[in-house]
Amino acid sequence: MYAVIRAGSKQFRVSPGDVIKVDSAPHSESGKLEIADVLAVSNGQGKFGSPENATVTAEILGDGRGDKILVFHYKRKKQYKKLQGHRQGFTALKITEINVDGEKFTIDDMPKKEAAPAKARRSTKKAAAAE
């Protein structure tokens, strides 16, 4: 089960249990955020084109700032150099449930991912000689 939502000016493909970082969003102290701007929902058969009565509920994990991006300006032959740094603020959200037409899908409803089998290690000549 996944949904495509619009948060801020970006679109995200989310499932229950996912953690996403959206541009700093104004939020209340309740710790919950309901996103009603759902673009598509899929649970095997897809519902595309702004499904009605679809919302995504998220838990607010906190605010933060991203990595620093350096912006360097210079003018050749004029000895002019300017270095600026910028850190974009974000709000971390954990998707708790997807509601579609009265049905709620949570992390407990998601199929469990099976662990991939361990790959067999290839022996090298040095390792074979040491044994």
UniProtKB/Swiss-Prot annotation:
Biased composition (Basic and acidic residues): 106-116
Keyword Ribonucleoprotein appears in the UniProt entry: yes
Entry keyword Ribonucleoprotein: yes
UniProt region (Disordered), positions on chain: 106-131
Matching InterPro entries: bL21-like, bL21-like_sf, Ribosomal_bL21
Keywords: Ribonucleoprotein, Ribosomal protein, RNA-binding, rRNA-binding
GO biological process: translation
GO molecular function, one term: rRNA binding
GO cellular component, one term: cytoplasm
Family from the record: Belongs to the bacterial ribosomal protein bL21 family.
Described purpose of this protein according to its UniProt entry: This protein binds to 23S rRNA in the presence of protein L20.
NCBIfam families hit by this protein: L21
Alphabetized HAMAP family for the sequence: Ribosomal_bL21
Quaternary structure annotation from Swiss-Prot or TrEMBL: Part of the 50S ribosomal subunit. Contacts protein L20.
UniProt-recorded name of the protein: Large ribosomal subunit protein bL21
The species this protein was found in: Koribacter versatilis (strain Ellin345)
Gene that this polypeptide is encoded by: rplU
